[in-house]
A protein has these predicted regions:
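A structured, charge-rich N-terminal accessory region that forms the first stable segment of a protein
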Residues: 2-85
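Charged, often glycine-rich, active-site loop that binds/positions anionic groups
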Residues: 83-87, 131-144
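A short, highly charged nucleic-acid-interacting micro-segment common to nuclease
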Residues: 85-109, 129-132
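Conserved catalytic cores of phosphodiester-cleaving nucleases, focusing on short active-site segments
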Residues: 112, 142-144, 155-162
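A short acidic/basic microdomain associated with nuclease active sites
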Residues: 115-135
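Short, solvent-exposed loop/turn segments that connect beta-strands within catalytic domains
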Residues: 120, 148-153
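Acidic, metal/cofactor-coordinating or nucleic-acid-engaging core segments within structured domains
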Residues: 170-245, 251-258, 262
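Extended, charged low-complexity segments
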Residues: 255-308
Length: 308
């Protein structure tokens, strides 16, 4: 399967160097929403190494799975630094500074790839933009589809924040409560479904259904078309996940290595108390909100080490 080939390439080049060595995932805690804490390694060199691997992942972030497989076959991934430079020039918007959303969007995509094994990249902001004026599509920070061995269809709608803790917490709340609705979702999905031909076959099957809804109902208002999309999700039993990444500066958590696990668990309790009563009635279909939280000791060093 192409998925197996893609994940094999990823694991060889990136995954095996990060999983449970530079990045650790804890068990998820589930109440009204699901909360998954992460942390990075304690060694003071960790943020630099993590930033360097994030840079090496840029090509895999900016290109679809099938394109990555083809590039690997042609030997283009032997030097991931060159591949990253190419992707930055050809696929990524020219954004600089701490406000550059690429840092958080790429880290979300990296963690999804690192800790799942059947999620197909449907869109990142990197994939669709107008080269002439460098305008990006407006929508979720990441969009993925997974179809498991039982043919269950899962749609992952991503929002990612990186920066101060207060900013990350408040903006995730604002984005989900303000944007995560079927109208907003339909607008992006219809745009992509009309253009995407590079993702893997199972994801394309669902995309084709979405494109059919768009075409068959093109004379209707966007609100009516969004309702038709909701009906498709119901008919096809599409599971919707709003996956949110909060990656924020929190050096105090890493002060004492032997207390690190407890500090992380206390941190997730605080996040949970903030969000438990939020994100109700986002869409009419059933959905889950997944909150992935990774405190970072030196966020500035991580960004600088990405070199973008």
């Amino acid at each position: 399967m192409s998925e197996d080939v893609y994940y094999g390439i990823f694991d060889d080049l990136i995954g095996k160097h990060l999983r449970d060595s530079l990045i650790y995932r804890y068990d998820a805690q589930k109440n009204n929403h699901e909360y998954t804490p992460f942390r990075h390694h304690y060694d003071p060199n960790t943020e630099r190494l993590l930033g360097e691997f994030m840079r090496k992942y840029i090509f895999m972030y900016a290109y679809s799975e099938s394109e990555v497989i083809k590039a690997n076959e042609k030997g283009r991934l032997r030097d991931l630094e060159k591949a990253a430079k190419f992707a930055l020039e050809e696929r990524l918007p020219r954004r600089k500074g701490a406000s550059n959303g690429l840092y958080s969007e790429l880290l979300l995509d990296l963690l999804i790839t690192l800790y799942t094994n059947n999620v197909n990249k449907l869109a990142t902001r990197a994939i669709y933009r107008q080269h002439s004026d460098n305008q990006e599509i407006k929508g979720y920070d990441g969009l993925h589809i997974s179809v498991d061995s039982q043919e269950n269809k899962n749609l992952w709608l991503g929002q990612a924040k990186m920066g101060r803790r207060s900013y990350c917490v408040s903006d995730i709340k604002k984005d989900l409560n303000g944007k995560a609705n079927m109208l907003y979702t339909a607008d992006q999905l219809f745009f992509i479904a009309d253009k995407e031909e590079r993702t893997l076959p199972k994801a394309l099957e669902l995309l084709e259904m979405i494109n059919d809804v768009s075409w068959d109902n093109r004379t209707l208002s966007i609100d009516e078309r969004a309702t038709k999309l909701s009906e498709l999700f119901e008919k096809e039993n599409v599971n919707v996940f709003f996956i949110c990444l909060l990656a924020y500066d929190r050096p105090s958590i890493y002060e004492l290595e032997d207390k690190l696990d407890n500090e992380i668990l206390e941190e997730i309790k605080s996040i949970q108390s903030t969000y438990e009563e939020e994100f109700k009635d986002l869409i009419s279909n059933e959905y889950e909100v997944l909150l992935w939280v990774i405190p970072i000791r030196d966020l500035q060093l991580l960004r600088e080490s990405m070199g973008i």
